[in-house]
């Protein structure tokens, strides 16, 4: 590993762990309401689950395929990355354990207390024993593992009680699945929030289940399985419906190899070795956890505890003040472009556009790409209504949206039954773009309404994620959007564009070309600037171009919420680059690209991060902002985020992140944007 690579590049996986550490920091922040802190701890845990299932799983796959292959930024092999990951995760888990303990101690002031059999009253113990006997034990399905009994299949992320039993013939293990049929929390006292987790109850009374054996020791275990399924390998039978292929792959995922074993207590070394042998788990894949193995039970407290101090204040998405309720959306979009900023503004105006299109006699067709949808989607309702109204409706459903495959398979069938034409993306590329095209014919004239978004067509996430949606009647944009859909309908890729940036053929190269233009301006002594607000930065081609720009004096300001493989502020290399990360109440999800300064500034919104998977391995779309009012609004938003000194962290030259601290008035950019949306909506309501 060269000294330069150490200084200016960070490993993708380790950088992501730094992001998750920032999530955990929110769980440790006293200013965050107590139950919201619990939520952040839960998000930290679920983030790690997915990280192991996908990223760690893929590294194990890479070790099997080519153990000597090195990552292209820090030159680490898969084995070296895994070793570093396991070490760092164990450190972070220790912090999470401490955080959970502090949160639960604070919740005692509100009557909440997690029980174990060291702190229950005699009356509570009697209730728990009877509860186990009558409500739990009859539903248990105990298993014995030894030489005569095959090792059972352990479900991904399920909790099991593992009981080491005395045996004269070798190691014998009892397994008790903690079924989803059980209520997770047991409350042994009426009108009290003192509770015991059902898995702790089962573990305590396990000797009653294995009453013919002597229990030597016992623990709770939870495994995480590799979920990095390969779609391309499954496409060997071209006659199979793609939905059938994906359904088979989803089943296959549930049975992939374990990559992590979590245990709640120490287990006899012989018993633990036996478990690891059966699970094909090495010692460094074992994680000793002092907190509950699944923290999702905490969400129930939000319904139980209504004290305002425990929750964020309610923020209701507002109707955009730029939208007039007394005119159709199409009429307003034809007059000027409209931008919605979620979750501060309501997605309802976009949904209204779709329903209006169903009633518009001039609408000929509607085309849309779908990636992740809400469980009860009004957007699907609108598309069905459009088809029932006789419009030509083309829907590209991305069946490979990870962990949403089953949901999308179901929606694709629903749309097809309604009369929509349903297509899928190219075999080797996910379609991640957020693109809608409404085509109207007014007399002899063809009109387009195009919408490009940074986030999914999902009503639920539109209240939780920060995203942008721009709707325009620009004919040139509409024509190019139509070209995108035509190419996808034919199973082809867009080879070139003039206005839209469309991956995989014309996004990365156009971005680097625009950075080159700023480099040339800097060489001429003219103002030069590159900015980006993205979720992740790992595309080495773009990273190296940004480093080149920094070396030539271009000012580069990046807002990167998650992983960032570029290290900023390194003398002589990246000292003209700053990296800010905002982790707050809402998940930062919008993408904004900026090239140039002042009147020469060009801006885009996009579904694509600066990651190789987005820039050259997916179909993505970036929309140029041609409306000057929206361009100014976007720039103002970007500047506000750079000034955030409440939820922003800044990256240091050693790759670490510290909270931004200054003597200025506290500015939480997310709260600022909500208050701005509320103020504008209130003024509109008064007119």
Where are these regions (language model features)?
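N-terminal localization/anchoring segments of enzymes in phospholipid and broader phosphate metabolism
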Residues: 1-530, 548, 552, 564-687
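Glycine/threonine-rich ATP-lid/beta-loop region of ATP-binding domains
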Residues: 540-543, 547
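Hydrophobic alpha/beta core scaffold segments
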Residues: 555-559
């Amino acid at each position: 590993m060269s000294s330069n690579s150490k200084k200016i590049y960070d490993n993708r996986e380790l950088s992501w762990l730094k992001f998750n550490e920032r999530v955990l920091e929110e769980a440790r922040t006293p200013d965050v309401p107590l139950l919201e802190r619990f939520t952040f701890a839960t998000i930290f845990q679920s983030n790690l689950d997915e990280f192991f299932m996908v990223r760690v799983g893929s590294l194990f796959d890479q070790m099997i395929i080519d153990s000597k292959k090195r990552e292209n930024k820090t030159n680490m092999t898969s084995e070296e990355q895994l070793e570093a990951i396991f070490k760092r995760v164990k450190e972070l888990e220790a912090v999470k354990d401490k955080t959970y303990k502090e949160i639960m101690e604070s919740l005692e002031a509100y009557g909440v207390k997690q029980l174990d059999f060291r702190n229950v009253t005699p009356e509570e113990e009697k209730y728990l024993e009877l509860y186990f006997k009558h409500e739990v034990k009859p539903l248990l399905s105990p298993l014995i593992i030894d030489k005569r009994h095959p090792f059972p299949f352990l479900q991904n992320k399920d909790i099991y009680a593992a009981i080491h039993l005395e045996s004269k013939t070798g190691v014998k293990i009892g397994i008790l699945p903690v079924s989803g049929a059980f209520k997770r929390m047991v409350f042994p006292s009426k009108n009290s929030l003192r509770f015991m987790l059902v898995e702790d109850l089962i573990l305590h009374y396990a000797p009653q289940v294995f009453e013919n054996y002597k229990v030597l020791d016992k623990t709770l275990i939870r495994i995480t399985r590799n979920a990095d399924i390969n779609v391309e390998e499954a496409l060997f039978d071209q006659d199979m419906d793609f939905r059938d292929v994906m359904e088979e792959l989803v089943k296959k995922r549930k049975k992939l190899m374990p990559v992590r074993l979590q245990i709640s207590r120490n287990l006899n070394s012989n018993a633990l070795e036996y478990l690891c042998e059966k699970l094909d788990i090495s010692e460094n894949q074992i994680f000793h956890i002092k907190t509950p193995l699944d923290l999702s039970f905490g969400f129930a407290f939000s319904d139980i505890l209504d004290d305002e101090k425990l929750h964020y204040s309610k923020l209701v998405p507002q109707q955009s003040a730029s939208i007039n309720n007394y005119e159709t959306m199409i009429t307003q979009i034809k007059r000027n472009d409209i931008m919605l900023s979620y979750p501060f503004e309501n997605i309802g105006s976009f949904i209204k556009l779709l329903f209006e299109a169903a009633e518009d006699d001039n609408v000929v067709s509607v085309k849309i790409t779908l990636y992740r949808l809400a469980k009860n989607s009004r957007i699907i309702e609108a598309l069905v209504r459009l088809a029932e109204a006789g419009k030509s409706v083309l829907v590209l459903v991305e069946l490979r949206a990870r962990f949403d495959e089953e949901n999308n398979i179901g929606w694709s069938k629903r749309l097809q039954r309604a009369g929509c034409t349903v297509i899928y993306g190219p075999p080797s590329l996910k379609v991640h773009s957020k693109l809608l095209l409404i085509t109207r014919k007014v007399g002899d004239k063809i009109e387009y309404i195009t919408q490009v978004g940074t986030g999914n067509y999902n009503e639920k996430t539109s209240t939780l994620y920060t995203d942008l949606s721009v709707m325009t009647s620009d004919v040139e944009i509409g024509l190019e959007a139509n070209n995108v859909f035509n190419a996808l309908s034919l199973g082809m890729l867009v080879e070139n564009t003039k206005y839209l940036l469309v991956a995989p053929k014309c996004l990365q190269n156009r971005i680097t070309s625009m950075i080159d233009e700023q480099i040339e301006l800097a060489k001429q002594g003219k103002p030069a600037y590159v900015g980006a607000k993205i979720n992740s930065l790992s595309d080495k081609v773009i990273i190296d171009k940004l480093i080149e720009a920094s070396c030539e004096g271009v000012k580069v300001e990046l807002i990167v919420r998650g992983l960032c493989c570029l290290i900023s502020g390194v003398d002589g290399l990246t000292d003209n680059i700053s990296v800010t990360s905002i982790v707050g109440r809402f998940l930062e999800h919008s993408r904004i690209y900026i090239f140039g300064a002042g009147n020469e500034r060009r801006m885009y919104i996009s579904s694509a991060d600066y990651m190789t998977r987005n820039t050259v391995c997916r179909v993505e779309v970036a929309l140029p902002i041609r409306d000057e009012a929206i361009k100014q609004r976007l720039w103002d938003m970007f500047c506000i985020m750079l000034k955030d000194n409440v939820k922003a962290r800044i990256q240091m030259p050693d790759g670490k992140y510290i909270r931004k601290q200054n003597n200025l008035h506290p500015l939480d950019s997310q709260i600022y944007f909500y208050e701005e949306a509320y103020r504008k909506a209130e003024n509109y309501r008064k007119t």
